[in-house]
Amino acid sequence: MTEKTIKDWEALAEKELRVSPEGLVWHTPEGIDVKPLYTSDDMSGIGHLNSLPGFEPFVRGPRATMYAGRPWTVRQYAGFSTAEASNAFYRRNLAAGQQGVSVAFDLATHRGYDSDHPRVQGDVGKAGVAIDSVEDMKILFDGIPLDRISVSMTMNGAVIPILASFIVAGEEQGVSRDKLSGTIQNDILKEFMVRNTYIYPPEPSMRIVADIIEYTAKEMPKFNSISISGYHMQEAGATLVQELAFTLADGREYVRAALAKGLNVDDFAGRLSFFFAIGMNFFMEAAKLRAARLLWTRIMQEFKPEKASSLMLRTHCQTSGVSLQEQDPYNNIVRTAFEAMSAVLGGTQSLHTNSFDEAMALPTDFSARIARNTQLILQHETGVTKVVDPLAGSYYVESLTNELAEKAWGLIEEVEALGGMTKAVNAGLPKRLIEEAATRRQAAVDRAEEVIVGVNKYRLENEQPIDILQIDNAAVRTAQVKRIEETRRRRDSQKMKQALDALADVARSGKGNLLAAAVEAARARATVGEITDAMREAFGDYTAIPEVVTDIYGKAYEGDPELGVLAGRLGEATKRLGHKPKIMVAKLGQDGHDRGAKVIASAFGDIGFDVVAGPLFQTPEEAADLALAEEVTVIGVSSLAAGHRTLMPQLAEALKKRGGEDIIVVCGGVIPRQDYDYLMENGVAAVFGPGTQVLDAARAVLDLIEGKRRNV
């Protein structure tokens, strides 16, 4: 048989297609041109091909036997309502096969507010569990043996009081801190880029990171001091190259901060962990994890560690939240299963699989069971655990691994040229690039250039709402306030004040360890809010200035008659109003997830609206004041954290009290269909759920403006 060449294949492909196979090249958002065929020629120059699992550069995995020796940890992220409700949920799941606990805190806790603070009325218990003191933490882990069950906590802004409360809760359960195992996220740099649950400015925030690394290295040898997260970057719109590069650049910055504390790299590097998102780009996501291990080894070699474990990247993964769709939601089960398989083939150490209903609300017991069992089926029924790194040697996957690594390294070097990640964050580079990528993707989805089944193709004509978990925010807040009052009544106030004063002195002086001081304050029953405020006196608050990218969404629609018709209507409305229709895009409460708000502000601006980008964390009253001062026609509220039932009626009432009834109020985001009527009855003119195309939303807003003008 005559050996065939790539030229032979090209000729045959062209005969089948009747055009050149070059038209099959997939131009990805990462700037990688994926070919329809890969061969041994694509392996040339790839340096890691002969590496083995358990040995540097760890492309094939950090452990020699990987899942053949022990499967990945099933670690489902959850938390809602009260500590009692979340504890019951954790215990049910542990009994059903879950192998670790991963805690989701509510936004009030993330931002360092106690549940009785007036700014968090709509946030308590809604998107996670409310924790105000050690008393809540003890209830959260009641009956869960902390010396045997590892605990992961997603916490960044209020990381000091939360970790301190966890340490004390463990002590009072009879588990000393050196026996506690798990992970604290403690990744503040990405908060300034995408998630926004920061409290203090970047510099003191980096001190907090370093103090936690120092404390855990000395006192908590089984505990991971940081989980460096790319997950939230991808959720905010980052490409896989951006997620990879910015996450590893964050990691490099944290290592430098720990070294500046006088630590030896081998004292802490083995306890650094990572956290990546896994989306629907199946092979590229698996290759991303392989590239991450390769690049992290390269970065850590700069610091000349003696232990091989200091060079290893160990990661947790979570299936994509962005890929979850409200429309035809049972499709999400399939999406999550594919993403889980991709994470496993990429070599994750632990995994969370999202529940199919999380595009609308917190998961129910039913949806959480399906999500958990997705992993158990992978572990026990597919045979995927039997072979270490089964994708190794694949022409396609090895080429992708190499190209992702090269492109990510180029972006890492760009960050270095700015002086490292803290300076890059201050310069706004990562945030701008991620927001541009998010806006481009929204345009691609709206134009059906990127197909999402059930959303922009193969849509159901009639969809039935599914059962969702509803949280009674008012009841949760009442219960939390009662417990706070009881805690304050029973504690030794003088001892508590002395502990807070000592913490404030450590913060002001720069001497001592913040976490060590906070542990004493938590033991004296200082609350999360009180510990946060003690440090706030020294560090101050951080306030981001809203900025919006331009000419991204509009460019995607250049020459499109659909946009031309809308622009014509906007021109007519401008003549009638005497100015461009003006919309304020607002975020209420402690919901810092601003991807949707930024995309809407950017796209509406490109379409021709006059856009006011409101600041994060506004109260309804503050939003009403700003809307009146800016003389806006419309307020568009983006809600992604379930606070809409409380905050939207409060906004309508605030506008009414100020004589702003004529301002049209609309909202969009993660809002269950079951809530639409309630919102419409409480001052909301239109609701735009997940999957709404931007041009459809713009047309609907313009319809409301025209109708309002005609009624005047």
UniProtKB/Swiss-Prot annotation:
Belongs to the methylmalonyl-CoA mutase family. Homodimer. This is Methylmalonyl-CoA mutase. GO terms for biological process: propionate metabolic process, methylmalonyl pathway. GO terms for cellular component: cytoplasm. Adenosylcob(III)alamin binds at H593. Optimum temperature is 37 degrees Celsius. Disulfide bonds: none annotated. Optimum pH is 7.0. Keywords: Cobalamin, Cobalt, Isomerase, Metal-binding, Plasmid. Radical enzyme that catalyzes the transformation of methylmalonyl-CoA to succinyl-CoA. Is required for growth on the polyhydroxyalkanoate degradation pathway intermediates 3-hydroxybutyrate and acetoacetate as sole carbon source.
